[in-house]
């Protein structure tokens, strides 16, 4: 089965906050965001268009979405994608949801990531017009 990944047109920033930080309500009005919290800190991935006062931030990430549906019985999807990108020395930031996986790569490595994935037989949708 040939996997399809869609490239989101937005760029994203990964923010770091203290574990007890209160996020602005505007965060929750965004179309897409991801929050992770541990005892050490709170991480937020959100569109770079939203400026936030975080402890640290890493801007310039592009996002691949693995198009599904993906069942919990499907194994190795993230491993295969990350392995393909690792072979090309492309760092990733991976996020999984109940429905699918998201793989973020730095903007300056996006073209290389697309080429590497296509070479391995992945179908890449690069604009909403292709959906």
Model feature map: region roles:
Residues 88-103, 109-111, 128-131:
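A cross-kingdom feature marking solvent-exposed beta-strand/loop segments within repeated
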Residues 41-46, 100-106:
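A generic structural motif
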Residues 1-88, 112-131:
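Regulatory modules associated with amino-acid/nitrogen control
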